[in-house]
Amino acid sequence: MQLPVQLSSPLALAVLSIATCQLALVWWYQRKRTNPLPPGPSALPFLGNAHQIPLQYPERIFSQWARTYGGVMYLRLFKKSVLILDSVKAAQDLMDKRGAKFSDRPQLTLITDVFAFKPMMFTMPYGDLWRRHRKWYQASLESKAALDTYNAVQEMETCTLLSALVSDSEHFADQVKRFTGAILLEIVYGHAVTSVKDDLIRLSDEMMTQAVSAGSLVATLLDFFPFLMHIPEWFPGGGFKREGARVRHLMRQLLDVPFNEVQQAMLEGSGKACLTTYMLEEQAEHGDLTPDDVDNIKGAATLLFIAGTDTTITTLLTFFLAMVLHPEVVHKAQAEIDRVVGRTRLPSLMDRDALPYLDQVLKEVYRWNPPVPLGIPHQVRDDDVYNGRHIPGGSMVVSNIWSMSRDPDTYEDADRFWPERYEGKSSDELARSDPRRIVYGFGRRLCPGRFLADSSIWLAAARVIATLDIRKVLDAEGKEMTPSAEFISGAVSHPKPFSLDILPRDEVAAKLIAQLDPNHLFSVQGEAI
C-alpha cells in the first residue's frame, strides 16, 4: 500500500517541518512551565527591578535578598534578565562546570563604544578572538617558567618600595601605585620606571579616574538602551559623551605610546624581552602584521597593565589599612618571619610555604575587601536549567563575590579582620575557605594575571612586615588617629583615603633597608633621595 504523498515531496517535507516546529514550541513552553525562573523580588512593568537596586554598594542589597531568595536569584533590569549568584557552589556549578554556556560577556556599551576599551579580552564575547588573547596571556602569565622570569623585577621593586615608604610615608598610596605600575610596565613593555611621576603611570591613573567619574548609572542606561549613544552632547544627559571623549583620548595614548616605543626599540635592535615583544614575534610567525593584529596586541598589553594595576593597588592599600588597625597581627607575622627567615635578609618568594601565618594574613586581606565585589558579569549563551529552575539564554550573570566572602557558614564573624580563622582546618576546609578561589573570578573568564598579582602582593607584604612598623598618625595633641575601615563603592572597591606612619622596626631593619640601592629611592616629587 502506498502513502498518498511521498515523504520526499515538498509538501510532505513542509508538513513534517511545521509539525516538528509545533512540537518544539510545545516542548519549549512546557519546559518553561515545568521549570520556573529562580526566585527574586517582585518586578515592575518596564523597570523590572531597576528601581530596587541602589547605585552605591549594590552587592549589599543583593546579599540581603539572598537571605530570602537563596543563592541564585532572578532579576529583570528593564528588558534584560539578570542572574545574581550569591553562592560559591552555584558560581562553580554554572561558570566552572558549564563554561561553554556561561562564558560569554554582555554588551558593555560605555566601556567599549564610548571609552574605546577595545579590543580587550574582558569585553569580548566568547569566541575565537577571545581565545587568541587568552592564549597570549596563558603563555606569559600562567606557566611557572614564565612567572619565574618575573621574580627579579618583583624583588627589585619591593626593595624600592621599602626605601620609598621609609623616606615618604605620607604619600604611601603613591608609592604603592608606583610599585605596582613599575612591575607591570617592565613585564608588559620592558619599560623601567624611574619616577613616581612616570608618564605611563600618571596616564593610567588619570584615565581610570576619568572613567570612574562617568558613573555607573550612565553605564547601566547605555547597556540597556544603546540608542542613547545617538543623542547629541548638548542634549540633557548627553554629557557622558564629553567625558567619554576625554577617557578615549587618554586610552588612545595608553594603547599607542608604549607599544610604539617597543616596536621602535625592536627595529633598532634594542628591544627588551616583554609581553609585547612576545606577541609581536609570535604573530609575525604567521605572516606580516595586519592593522587588526596590531590593534589586538595593543589591546592585550594595555589591558594587563591597567587592570592589573588597579586591582593590585586596592589589595595592597587594604593590606596597609588592616595592618594599621591590627598591630597584633603585624607583630605575630613579624615573629614568624624572624623565626623562619632571620633578620639578616629580606623574605623571598622561596620562603612562602614556610610562612603559613603570613599566608593567612593575605587570605584575610582578600576576603575582607574583595577588589572587584561583583566581578565582571558573564552572559548565558543558551537556555539552561539549574536545580529545577529555568535560566533564560542571554541572561547577564553577576557573581556577588563580596557576599560570598562573608558567607556565615564559611566565615564566622565575617566583618572582623581575623587571620586566625584559617587555623586548625582540614585541607578540604582550607581549600573551601581560601578567598583566592573567588576573588579572581570563575570559569573560563578567570583572571589570567592572578598568579603574578598574588606573588607581587605576597612579596610586598612579607618585606613590609619584616622590616617596618605601621603606626597610626598622631594628632596635634599627640593622640592616635584611628582610620575607618570603609571602602568606596564601585566596580573596584578601594579603601577610603586614610593616613598612617611608617618607620623601620628597629636599627637592624634600618640598616637592612639602608643597604638597598639609593638610586631606587623616590619621593612623591619623583626625585632621587
Swiss-Prot record:
According to UniProt, this protein's pathway is: Secondary metabolite biosynthesis
Query: Of which family is this protein a member?
Result: Belongs to the cytochrome P450 family.
Function in brief: Cytochrome P450 monooxygenase that is able to use delta(6)-protoilludene as a substrate to produce delta(6)-protoilludene-5-ol.
So what EC number does this one have? 1.-.-.-
Keyword set, alphabetical order: Heme, Iron, Membrane, Metal-binding, Monooxygenase, Oxidoreductase, Transmembrane, Transmembrane helix
For this protein, the record's Pfam families field holds: p450
PANTHER family xref list: CYTOCHROME P450, P450, PUTATIVE (EUROFUNG)-RELATED-RELATED
The superkingdom listed in its UniProt entry is Eukaryota
Query: InterPro entries this protein is in?
Result: Cyt_P450, Cyt_P450_E_grp-I, Cyt_P450_sf, Cytochrome_P450_fung
Q: Which cofactor does it need?
A: heme
What is the membrane topology here? Answer: Single-pass membrane protein
| Keyword Membrane in record | yes
An annotated Gene Ontology molecular function: monooxygenase activity
Keyword presence, Transmembrane: yes
Q: Note the CDD domains from the entry.
A: CYP64-like (cd11065)
Q: Which GO terms describe its cellular component?
A: membrane
* Binding-site list for heme: 447
Designated name of the protein = Cytochrome P450 monooxygenase 136
Where in or outside the cell? Membrane
| Annotated TM spans | 9-29
